[in-house]
Amino acid sequence: MKFPSKEQIEQYRREYPVGCRVELVSMDDPQAPTKGTRGTVRGVDDIGNLLVRWDNGSGLNAVLGVDVVRKIRG
């Protein structure tokens, strides 16, 4: 797996600020929340993982560039 550049990480952080809401479109993980699950962004780590507190209680991170989430309104 190729890690994103510092510039890409900063772009992710601007695109997904702490507190914004997202909805899961797809995730390549057997423990993934179901499609359509919503959550609140807690941040983006230094390797490009989107840290999300999913509304179903899951804390599984989304890997930007692999998993797909979309921003939603509150």
Which role fits each region the language model picked out?
Residues 2-74:
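Basic/aromatic-rich interaction segments and small domains that mediate binding to polyanionic partners
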